[in-house]
Amino acid sequence: MITLRHMKNYLLGRTKVTMQYPEERWDSQLPPWYRGAPALVTDEHGKERCVACQLCEFICPPRAITITPEEIPNDTKWAKVEKRPQEFEIDMIRCIYCGLCEEVCPEQAIFLQKEYSISGYSREEMKHNKAKLYEMGGVKTGLVNKWNEKK
């Protein structure tokens, strides 16, 4: 009975089956819990939120994230207090978009975006470095109150 109803709606033109992809996108139809490509964000002052704690690297099931930490130079007020990533790379081919990296990040530096169309001509293009990840992520304003929001 359900199959006949669907067929009738399709034949009468009530059900739209095909989406003309480059012109039409699914952005408005994505659910709020959709997990797309991971990206890094900066704060409103342009400072990197990532402190190279490497929790996201350790929790990533397919080992798609690699981080090389470095010390912050002595000329800033954050010297010897925090680290920052010298290199931060995510292999988008290996990433399974599980969201564990976003959940474990204590500084809210990595987010899964709504972007679902990631392409490249080679495997090397699919390894996003720190600059590409910050370009995708942009700026995230506000205090880090991740654990207070869940109460």
Can you annotate each of these PLM segments?
Residues 98:
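Basic, alpha-helical nucleic-acid-binding regions used in initiation and control of genome expression
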Residues 1-83, 87-94, 103, 107-151:
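Non-ligating segments of multi-cofactor redox enzymes
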